[in-house]
Amino acid sequence: MLSKLPKSSKLVVIGGGIIGCSTAYHLAHMGLEVVLLERKKLTSGTTFHAAGLVGQLRTNANITQLLGYSVDLYNKLEKETGLGTGWKMNGGLRLACNNERWTEVQRQTTTAHSFGLEMDLLSPKEAQDLWPIMDISDVVGAAFLPTDGQANPSDITQALAKGARSKGATVI
């Protein structure tokens, strides 16, 4: 492995999980010289254990915007690299089973709209129409964010690494 190490690099990223590979990907796409170092195999750390759920709405507009960017990236990464990411835009459902939670879900929907996200308030029956096996006997209301989804973190990491390599990054 030491023979593969370049003598120098402008930037070195330590860790070949989704964060390290994303960092290398974006730096390489900016035209910067980058080396990514992983001590074992890509995704062999915490990325391997991640659930891969991608919910975009947060209380902070900047984080919500970053998560929206991630959704856009997952949509294009497969085309760019030829590697699957497991990305499925199947939406996210938020349930309210009491009036206090319903008020919170309504506020979240208002926040989503102010951040430019499509999020719809639903009756219990409308929520059940989306997921027919759901028992709605105690559901007061729901909200659905159609652009949320799920992905395979290991697959995304491999695609990010390939995308970084395609722009000149060295992944060791």
List PLM regions with ranges:
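Gly/Ala-rich phosphate-binding loop of Rossmann-like dinucleotide-binding domains
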Residues: 24, 28, 163
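Glycine-rich FAD pyrophosphate-binding loop
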Residues: 28-48
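Short beta-to-alpha linker loops that shape the active-site pocket of alpha/beta-hydrolase fold enzymes
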Residues: 40-42, 127, 160
